[in-house]
Curated annotation (Swiss-Prot):
The keyword Nucleotidyltransferase does not apply. Belongs to the Fmt family. InterPro entries: Fmt, Formyl_trans_C, Formyl_transf_N, Formyl_transf_N_sf, Formyl_transferase-like_C_sf, GART_AS, Met-tRNA-FMT_C, Met-tRNA-FMT_N. Keywords: Protein biosynthesis, Transferase. One of its GO terms (cellular component) is cytosol. It comes from the Bacteria. Gene3D superfamilies: 3.40.50.12230. (6S)-5,6,7,8-tetrahydrofolate binds at residues 113-116. This is Methionyl-tRNA formyltransferase.
Length: 313
């Protein structure tokens, strides 16, 4: 395999894992691009992005432009490095055509969906929310559009019924390096393939989307909860408070035709609520300003029986 000079662009954990794996290859990481440092937490302490932490640990130069319009000098610095390839995954900053034109073999984007399905910001969450049974990693030749570039390589994976956005994210973090290295190995001869099929869009997640609609089927609610775990978290409103849900299971048919959203019963093992077709049992709940707890632990300090028969929403 030919040794390539690579610039890497990414910001969150998933990007950091791919970068770690890329360092283990024979390729040369010339520089890393990541978002600017942010003040986080109650103390507003400045924190580096996960990608920056990995880059610094490997003594690699780091560029952190606010944008390429505000920091055009970064483009010039990248040009001077004359990279063969720029690899991009979850960078979070819009790149201009001038950026795309710099590397010899162009810019490769690692996108975690089977394009053209779920173009955009939240492909993992939207795939689970929609009830998809498969997804994958696409290595895409970047162009000026939103995830519209030609496909260079694909790795397909199944979405399990127990997968959440977190577990699927972790799978992608581990698996993405394989199709990337395969693509880099064949970069001089690989034939780009235009995306085939009708595109769908993975719009950015909002906090309000976590609200559970109990008039839907138990399966749809399951997809909803798993899609929004861990963020923003699925929840229902009880006494004007947002109660986040944790572990759950789908039980029997709603044979008594209880109205969807009715709290059927509360046991030490769970909090049962009617959906449009079945009963769903929540084994864990999180009340405002509290930790996620098992129902048995909540019952030790809170009277929940008064809510039996109460209809949510």
């Amino acid at each position: 395999m030919k040794k390539l000079n690579i610039i890497f662009a990414g910001t969150p954990d998933i990007s950091a894992q791919v970068l770690k794996d890329l360092y283990k290859s024979q390729h040369n990481i010339q520089a890393v691009l990541t978002q600017p440092d942010r003040a986080k937490g109650r103390g507003k302490k400045v924190q580096f992005s996960p990608v920056k932490e990995v880059a610094l640990a490997n003594h690699t130069p780091v560029f952190q432009p606010l944008s390429f319009k505000k920091n055009p000098e970064v483009l010039e610095q990248i040009k001077q490095l004359k990279p063969d390839v720029i690899v991009v995954i979850a960078y979070g900053i819009i790149v201009p055509q001038e950026f795309l034109d710099i590397p010899r073999y162009g810019c490769l984007n690692i996108h975690v969906s089977l394009l053209p399905k779920w173009r955009g910001a939240a492909p993992i969450q939207r795939a689970i929310q929609a009830g998809d049974t498969k997804t994958g990693v696409c290595i895409m030749q970047m162009d000026a559009g939103l995830d519209t570039g030609d496909i260079l390589n694909t790795l397909e994976i199944e979405i399990q019924e127990t997968d959440t956005s977190q577990t699927l994210h972790d799978k992608f973090a581990k698996l993405s390096i394989k199709p990337l290295l395969e693509t880099l190995e064949k970069i001089e001869i690989i034939k780009p393939e235009p995306q085939q099929g009708e595109p769908t869009y993975a719009h950015k997640i909002t906090k309000q989307e976590g609200l559970i609609d109990f008039t839907k089927s138990a399966w749809r609610i399951s997809c909803h909860i798993r899609a929004f775990t861990p963020w923003p978290g699925a929840y229902f409103i009880l006494d004007d408070e947002a109660i986040k849900v944790g572990e759950f299971e789908i039980l029997y048919q709603n044979t008594d035709n209880r109205k969807a959203g009715t709290i059927i019963d509360i046991y030490r093992s769970g909090f049962d609520i009617a959906t449009s077709d079945k009963i769903i049992r929540f084994r864990q709940l999180q009340f405002p300003n509290k930790k996620m707890l098992n129902i048995v632990d909540i019952l030790n300090g809170k009277d929940l029986d008064k809510y039996i028969g109460y209809k949510l929403g």
